[in-house]
Curated annotation (Swiss-Prot):
<dbReference type="GO" id="GO:0008878">
    <property type="term" value="F:glucose-1-phosphate adenylyltransferase activity"/>
</dbReference>
<comment type="function">
    <text>Involved in the biosynthesis of ADP-glucose, a building block required for the elongation reactions to produce glycogen. Catalyzes the reaction between ATP and alpha-D-glucose 1-phosphate (G1P) to produce pyrophosphate and ADP-Glc.</text>
</comment>
<comment type="similarity">
    <text>Belongs to the bacterial/plant glucose-1-phosphate adenylyltransferase family.</text>
</comment>
<feature type="binding site">
    <location>
        <position position="370"/>
    </location>
    <ligand>
        <name>AMP</name>
    </ligand>
</feature>
<feature type="site" description="Could play a key role in the communication between the regulatory and the substrate sites">
    <location>
        <position position="113"/>
    </location>
</feature>
<feature type="site" description="Could play a key role in the communication between the regulatory and the substrate sites">
    <location>
        <position position="74"/>
    </location>
</feature>
<feature type="binding site">
    <location>
        <position position="114"/>
    </location>
    <ligand>
        <name>alpha-D-glucose 1-phosphate</name>
    </ligand>
</feature>
<feature type="binding site">
    <location>
        <position position="40"/>
    </location>
    <ligand>
        <name>AMP</name>
    </ligand>
</feature>
<feature type="binding site">
    <location>
        <position position="386"/>
    </location>
    <ligand>
        <name>AMP</name>
    </ligand>
</feature>
<keyword id="KW-0067">ATP-binding</keyword>
<dbReference type="Pfam" id="PF00483">
    <property type="entry name" value="NTP_transferase"/>
</dbReference>
<feature type="binding site">
    <location>
        <position position="46"/>
    </location>
    <ligand>
        <name>AMP</name>
    </ligand>
</feature>
<comment type="subunit">
    <text>Homotetramer.</text>
</comment>
<dbReference type="InterPro" id="IPR056818">
    <property type="entry name" value="GlmU/GlgC-like_hexapep"/>
</dbReference>
<dbReference type="InterPro" id="IPR005836">
    <property type="entry name" value="ADP_Glu_pyroP_CS"/>
</dbReference>
<dbReference type="GO" id="GO:0005978">
    <property type="term" value="P:glycogen biosynthetic process"/>
</dbReference>
<keyword id="KW-0119">Carbohydrate metabolism</keyword>
Length: 431
């Protein structure tokens, strides 16, 4: 392990990102988000009033100084590709900066799509090698967090690692959804199990397990060797968590990087923020938290801005209707182009161009872009998908049986409404 002086670390913080390429795995289906991902990949799902989930990984790259980025796409990629083309065309080709869209090459006989996360990189190796990077940063495109990847790169170099895995403690009950590791005193990974049925607890804390975040730094040449060998292994599932990381661990070449060392947060005493938002409840909670008085995720930090595609929209408007009722909101996010007329909105997130007509009560709701809510509606604990038209007088979130019959209701009581569900409901009512 190499110990670096402060000036050396500052120099590396500038140099290492320039020697790196980031690969964002953005082809996931996100099946636990149910109908919300029927027509879009999970990284393209709207989040936080104006963003897409992938904007966080892309913004982290930009803010960390990594300006060579490959986005590996697959499932329902049109919306994602369109978003990146419109909102992330700021890089200069003359300066060797880019966001490259890398669809499935479908080069394997008998295989149409990527066989696993590692295969997603393998299929694009011919392109990736042309980047001539010394380090490859592998990222998931479907997580919400702020991280300075330059700090993780410095940690990788200091430890003399060939592979570094970002990690953080998670409740033991949630650890079955992650790769779980054990480390020694030097943070070398000595054991790694992907999504174990009985996760091993952290030493000294039976309530937590040390989980992989799916964020990796590799020496480029080492990664290429690993992927070439994995590609020829018929017994492999060609996945980083299931195959590549366990193999490196057995070889003693993998080190852990504690997420708090590179997490970007304005309050140093706050808990490091990282969310998977892979279920409807997690997605709903993470959105509504941003509307709270003190959100866990600081979206107002000008030193680490989250970038996205910005439409030219008029300001949000709150108006009095003809009866004299005022449009009001409390503890809510209301985006550009929204109009709230004579209704009350509480603890909710309204995406661009939402229209709420008179006499409505909106409470703990997430309304995606272009939702239109008719008069006298009551919406509670729900997610309304893009461009839904909620009929006059409709009540959602108050009757569990009725909600489950008409829409999708999760075990936690979160109701998801889509245009297709509303269309089917209308057909039934017209019979």
């Amino acid at each position: 392990m190499v110990s670096l002086e402060k000036n050396d670390r500052l120099m590396l913080a500038r140099q290492l990102p320039l020697k790196s390429v980031a690969l964002i795995l953005a082809g996931g289906r996100g099946t636990r988000l149910k109908d919300l991902t029927n027509k879009r990949a999970k990284p393209a799902v709207h989040f936080g009033g104006k963003f897409r989930i992938i904007d966080f990984a892309l913004s982290n790259c930009l803010n960390s100084g990594i300006r060579r980025i490959g986005v590996i796409t697959q499932y329902q990629s049109h919306t994602l590709v369109q978003h990146i083309q419109r909102g992330w065309s700021l890089f200069s080709e003359e300066m060797n900066e880019f966001v490259d869209l890398l669809p499935a090459q479908q080069r394997m006989q008998g295989e149409n799509w990527y066989r696993g996360t590692a295969d997603a990189v393998t299929q694009n190796l011919d392109i990736i090698r042309r980047y001539k990077a010394e380090y490859v940063v592998i990222l998931a495109g479907d997580h919400i967090y702020k991280q300075d990847y330059s700090r993780m790169l410095i940690d990788h170099v200091e430890k003399g690692a060939r592979c570094t895995v970002a990690c953080m403690p998670v409740p033991i009950k949630e650890a079955t959804a992650f790769g779980v590791m054990a480390v020694d005193e030097s943070e070398k990974i000595i054991d790694f199990v992907e999504k174990p049925a009985n996760p091993p607890a952290m030493p000294g804390d039976d309530s937590k397990a040390l989980a992989s975040m799916g964020i990796y730094v590799f020496d480029a040449d080492y990664l290429y060797e690993l992927l070439a060998a994995d590609d020829k292994d018929d017994a492999s599932s060609h996945d980083f968590g299931k195959d590549i990381i366990p193999k490196i661990t057995r070889e003693g070449m993998a080190y852990a990087h504690p997420f708090p060392l590179s997490c970007v947060q304005s309050d140093p005493d706050a808990e490091p923020y990282w969310r998977d938002v892979g279920t409807l409840e997690a997605y709903w909670k993470a959105n509504l938290d941003l509307a709270s008085v003190t959100p866990e995720l600081d979206m107002y930090d000008q030193n680490w801005p989250i970038r996205t595609h910005m439409e030219s929209l008029p300001p949000a408007k709150f108006v009095q209707d003809r009866s004299g009722s005022h449009g009001m909101t409390l503890n809510s996010l209301v985006s550009g182009g929204c109009i709230i007329s004579g209704s009350v909105v509480v603890q909710s997130v309204l995406f661009p161009r939402v229209r709420i007509n008179s006499f409505c009560n909106i409470d703990s709701a997430v309304l995606l872009p272009e939702v239109w809510v008719g008069r006298s509606c009551r919406l509670r604990r729900c997610i309304i998908d893009r461009a839904c038209i909620i009929p006059e007088g409709m009540v959602i979130g108050e009757n569990a049986e009725e909600d489950a019959r008409r829409f999708y209701r999760s075990e936690e009581g979160i109701v998801l409404v889509t245009r297709e569900m509303l269309r089917k409901l209308q057909v039934k009512q017209e019979r």
